[in-house]
From Swiss-Prot:
It comes from Agarivorans albus. This is Beta-agarase AgaB34. It catalyses: Hydrolysis of (1->4)-beta-D-galactosidic linkages in agarose, giving the tetramer as the predominant product. It is found in: Secreted. One of its GO terms (biological process) is carbohydrate catabolic process. Keywords: Disulfide bond, Glycosidase, Hydrolase, Lectin, Secreted, Signal. The active site is at E147 (nucleophile), E152 (proton donor). Residues 1-23 form the signal peptide.
């Protein structure tokens, strides 16, 4: 266990062995998120902590508050208390106990003293508690309107499914004047442990690369998750109106505090899923451990900002997706009206993937497939998300066959339909061959970004 390793190092120091006092626990653990060409990671000292000290000394108080960032004492039966967090044995410890004389729960919480903002990578090594309470690692904007949950799990839930399934979550809140919730657009994505039976069985790494307001991706035990990224979620106001969020207007665009805590959520306690007095008093169950947290920003590199209109090649070219590195492909090399497109492994010698851009007006083009000599068309000129994109006999007077290229930087661009104003994308951010090419509201996500190949 990590605490044992740190204790051993201290013993080694006492007998005179030389060690690097500035080494961090994560130094030999690669950062799993990918950088753009020429970039490097820069450690953010104000938020990174190995917890290689005891008590809440100046290192702790220089980075963290042992309370929430404002006066709220927590959801449901939660009562956040500074007495329920401390540093010892090389870990931050977040505990819980019964609040004397009440049915409430004293719970630990720490909050970063200042806010973070994209682009930024955060990762923590955490062993969750064995309680009905949730163990959490999350980000929340100061106005309580934007939330990114890197970890939420009921580690000791008596319902097995909840103990085995942690979630990553997004929330976009709209609030009333008294800060009560008017709308809560959210989506959750669940994951079982990469090893062991329960998340409480040991330390796991939970990370997020908040690259931009529309590019947020999670990492578990050093692996990028295949689901749950901002580009993949459907944000629904489940508890209020049932409406779907327009992600082309609202996204993860606000700076946020880092929060590590435990909570008794009202929806669970109201359903009878309550931490018992015995469990809350059990020192083997009532603690969440954080071995370390590291935070980095990407710096430097040759990444170029948007500069204006994109100029296509004069001849035929492939269209490569930024998120999957696969190419737009006419399915089965079809030659008829109404046939459709997919993404497929790139092959510049495959005519199914070769397209020519014919200029119609300033930054307006038709897109002609070499294999069929048919043009890319938005079926029926639909404005709906998910609308079919098909091949059809070319007619440059049709606005549903007219596309503009919007520069997104780093030699990538969006392809927008003139009639609908919406973007081409790969459905559900699929990385697989056969991923559907369709129309969707423009979000800036990488499954809507293309480059010439």
């Amino acid at each position: 266990m990590k605490g044992f390793t740190k204790h051993s190092i201290l013993m080694a120091c006492s007998i005179g062995l030389a060690i690097n006092a500035t080494a961090a626990d994560w130094d030999n653990i690669p950062i799993p998120a990918e950088l753009d060409a020429g970039q490097s990671w820069e450690l953010q000292q104000n938020y990174s902590d190995s917890f290689n000290y005891s008590g809440k000394n100046s290192t702790f108080t220089g980075k963290w508050k042992d309370s929430y960032f404002h006066s709220w004492t927590g959801p449901g039966l939660t009562h956040w208390s500074s007495d329920e967090s401390w540093v010892g044995d090389g870990n931050l410890i977040i505990s819980a106990s019964r609040r004397q004389g009440t049915n409430k729960v004293n719970a630990g919480v720490i909050t970063s003293k200042t806010k973070v903002k994209y682009p930024i990578f955060l990762e923590a090594s955490i062993k969750v508690s064995n309680l009905e309470l949730s163990s959490n690692f999350w980000l929340l904007s100061e106005n309580d309107q934007r939330e990114i949950d890197v970890l939420e799990v009921y580690g000791g839930a008596r319902q097995d499914w909840y103990a085995k399934n942690m979630s990553t979550n997004f929330h976009v809140f709209f609030r009333n004047n008294d800060n009560s919730i008017k709308n809560d657009y959210n989506d959750q994505t669940h994951f079982t442990p990469t090893w062991g039976n329960y998340w409480r069985d040991g330390f796991h790494r939970f990370g997020v690369y908040w690259k931009s307001p529309t590019d947020v991706t999670f990492y578990i035990d050093g692996q990028k998750t295949t689901k749950g990224a901002w580009s993949q979620v459907v944000m629904k106001d489940k508890d209020y109106t049932g409406a779907i969020l327009d992600k082309s207007r609202y996204n993860m665009d606000q700076e946020a505090f880092i929060i590590i805590d435990t909570e008794d959520h009202s929806w669970r306690s109201e359903a009878g899923h309550i931490a018992t007095d015995a469990d809350l008093a059990d020192s083997d169950k009532n603690k969440m451990y954080v071995d370390w947290i590291r935070v980095y920003k990407p710096t430097g590199g040759s990444t170029t900002p948007p500069t204006g209109d994109i100029t296509p090649p004069s001849g035929y070219t492939n269209l490569q997706l930024a998120h999957s590195n696969r190419c737009v492909d006419v399915i089965n090399g079809a030659l008829w009206n109404g046939s459709t497109y997919q993404q497929y492994s790139c092959n510049t010698g495959n005519n199914n993937q070769r397209f020519k851009f014919t200029k119609i007006a300033n930054n307006q083009y038709s897109i002609n497939a070499k294999v069929s000599q048919l043009c890319m068309e938005l079926a029926s000129g639909s404005s709906a998300n998910g609308a079919k994109v098909q091949q059809w006999i070319c007619n440059h007077a049709n606005s549903n066959q007219t596309w503009s290229l919007e520069d997104k930087g780093s030699n990538t661009f969006e392809i927008r339909n003139k009639q609908s104003g919406k973007c081409l994308e790969v459905a559900n951010s699929s990385n697989a061959n056969g991923g559907q090419i369709r129309q969707w509201a423009c979000t800036g996500a990488t499954n809507q970004r293309f480059k010439f190949l």
